[in-house]
Amino acid sequence: MKEGWIGDDYLVLFDEAEVAQVTARYQVATQLPGLNVIGLRGWDDLIVRDAVGSAHVVPSVPMDPQNMTPYVVPGHAALKQDSRFAGKIKWYLQPVVFGGDPNAGPNVAWVTHEQHGELVAWWNAKYRELKVNGGAA
């Protein structure tokens, strides 16, 4: 895994050997079958790759294919390391789609990569549940 800044975006780019494990952690097959997680952009978006190698970004919550946009993945060498954020991911305790405040403050916590995967999977399951039951999400 390599992480760092490129312009205004903080990126986490996973090594090829990590892709299957990370994809499973985020339970991407449930929401985006056939795609693999290859990175994170700005802590809020997953960078995914399709079977032909094209990359896209999609919000981590909700992980909806309608919200995917094409993305050109920069090379690892372009990333400017920043030890303040190494191994941490900014997480909204109540995701914005559920009415959480997007500004820094009491709604923001810093979590590990493993915790982030668990939180993304849990909140996406909650989103699907509400959507199926006609709730507002």
How would you describe each model-predicted region?
Residues 1-89, 94-137:
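Nuclease and nuclease-like effector domains acting on nucleic acids or nucleotide cofactors
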